[in-house]
Amino acid sequence: MALLDRTARSFLLTEIVSGMALTLKYFFKPKATINYPYEKNPISPRFKGEHALRRYANGEERCIACKLCEAVCPALAITIEAEPRADGSRRTTRYDIDMTKCIYCGLCEEACPVDAIVEGPNLEFATETREELMYNKDRLLANGDRWEPEIARRLELDAPYR
């Protein structure tokens, strides 16, 4: 009897027919993918993207050179140098992040007492050379200036969980 069943299945091509039926079933369903450059998925308020240094409303940079972010970084991607100012406060003279080392864990953002370093909403920061992935203070401040409204909104949404 098994020989007869096997012969009937191979003669009637039931496996091929069932495979084609499955293909036709999914062919007419809505697609699960998106057309990426033109369509984008919504991004979570907790998304960790490109780093940015923030400023206060008066234009002064927030970073107080406490170096907590440098100390907590597991990848050792952050380098900070600071000098005291005339008014007695400290400010950074050098703030570098090696984005090739960064693992986007967000520990630097959590450690910062003044919310100076944040991981912004930008996920499209591909470069052509490795040198472009070495972010200095000016580039980080420019990122902060560019994304400040979005960063402030996301920090406000995330405030109950911090």
Curated annotation (Swiss-Prot):
Protein name per its UniProtKB record: NADH-quinone oxidoreductase subunit I
Family: Belongs to the complex I 23 kDa subunit family.
Keyword annotations: 4Fe-4S, Cell inner membrane, Cell membrane, Iron, Iron-sulfur, Membrane, Metal-binding, NAD, Quinone, Repeat, Translocase, Ubiquinone
Domain named 4Fe-4S ferredoxin-type: residues: 53-83, 93-122
Protein role: NDH-1 shuttles electrons from NADH, via FMN and iron-sulfur (Fe-S) centers, to quinones in the respiratory chain. The immediate electron acceptor for the enzyme in this species is believed to be ubiquinone. Couples the redox reaction to proton translocation (for every two electrons transferred, four hydrogen ions are translocated across the cytoplasmic membrane), and thus conserves the redox energy in a proton gradient.
Subunit and partners: NDH-1 is composed of 14 different subunits. Subunits NuoA, H, J, K, L, M, N constitute the membrane sector of the complex.
InterPro entries per record: 4Fe4S_Fe-S-bd, 4Fe4S_Fe_S_CS, NADH_quinone_OxRdtase_chainI
Membrane topology, from the record: Peripheral membrane protein
Organism this protein belongs to: Granulibacter bethesdensis (strain ATCC BAA-1260 / CGDNIH1)
Alphabetical list of SUPFAM superfamilies matching this protein: 4Fe-4S ferredoxins
UniProt-listed Enzyme Commission number(s): 7.1.1.-
Binding residues annotated for [4Fe-4S] cluster 1, in chain numbering: 63, 66, 69, 112
GO biological process annotation, one example: aerobic respiration
Gene Ontology, cellular component aspect: plasma membrane
A Pfam match: Fer4_7
Amino-acid positions noted as binding [4Fe-4S] cluster 2 in the UniProt annotation, renumbered to this chain: 73, 102, 105, 108
Cofactors: [4Fe-4S] cluster
Free-text cofactor note: Binds 2 [4Fe-4S] clusters per subunit.
Top class in the EC scheme: translocase
Reactions this protein catalyses: a quinone + NADH + 5 H(+)(in) = a quinol + NAD(+) + 4 H(+)(out)
Localization annotation: Cell inner membrane
Record-level Gene Ontology MF annotations: 4 iron, 4 sulfur cluster binding; iron ion binding; NADH:ubiquinone reductase (non-electrogenic) activity; quinone binding
